[in-house]
Amino acid sequence: MTLQLAQLEPFARGGNRLCFVHPDDAGRCVKVRRPDFTLEDRRRKKGFPKNLKPLSSFDDNLEESRVMTGLEKRYGERIFRHVSRCYGFVDTDFGKGLVSELIRDGNGAISQTLKKYLWDHGLTEECQAAVQALGDFWQSQAVPSRDLLLHNIVVQRNNDGTIERLVVIDGLGSSGLIPAGWLPHSLQQRKSARKVANLHERIDILLGQRGQDTFPGFHGLLLHDDHPDHHNEKGGPVSP
């Protein structure tokens, strides 16, 4: 069965992909390649020698699926305390889509990114504690990742608005040429510690920009939050 997504409004748009609420499961999302930005376009933008790689190496969905399979095999269930789950591929009218866990707040709304939370509320005491918990987990478990970007982390909140946890939804996997699992554990931990330190630097930079009139960039903003109270009479989400 092919999922029909073209008539739906994506809730998020990245540089390479669109994210839709799964039509049959509100607890999952479907990530598809943006039709206006092909794999050929991505390869063309890369310089030598990266532009010599096969097209499949530029497919974010294939890479994410590979990485998530490896993380689950290595860490088991505990990785999903701070990382969203991956459920494999499905056919859509945009081509192959990757199905992932859709993190929602206690009130049913899609969880906002850490970037948006910090912009709206600043580094509150409970947010600081949540960032610390994520950082401690990342370093102790030596989770392999690229840079921990603020728009790739979501803040899951309880029904009363308090923070339940932070969840990394993108940017996972080894950032170097050598797979992280091949390195000594102490070196893996040091690499993870640098990623956490860089996260704190990004938080400080964003907090310094809060006096601006406009949100910095479009990354980190939801196109809609799919809150049950925000649906129109036909059941579709209403844009903010």
Predicted regions, residues:
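A short glycine-rich, hydrophobically flanked beta-strand micro-motif that places a catalytic Asp/Glu
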Residues: 82-89, 144-157
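Conserved catalytic motifs of the protein kinase core domain
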Residues: 25, 95-96, 164
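Active-site ExK catalytic segment of metal-dependent nucleases
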Residues: 29-35, 101, 170-172
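C-lobe/activation-segment region of protein kinase-like
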Residues: 51, 117-131, 136-146, 155-240
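Feature marks short, surface-exposed loop/turn motifs that line or immediately flank catalytic pockets
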Residues: 36-38, 93, 106-107, 172-176
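Conserved structural core of kinase catalytic domains
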Residues: 72-130
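ATP-binding glycine-rich loop module of kinase domains
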Residues: 15-70
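Conserved N-terminal boundary motif of the eukaryotic protein kinase catalytic domain
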Residues: 2-10
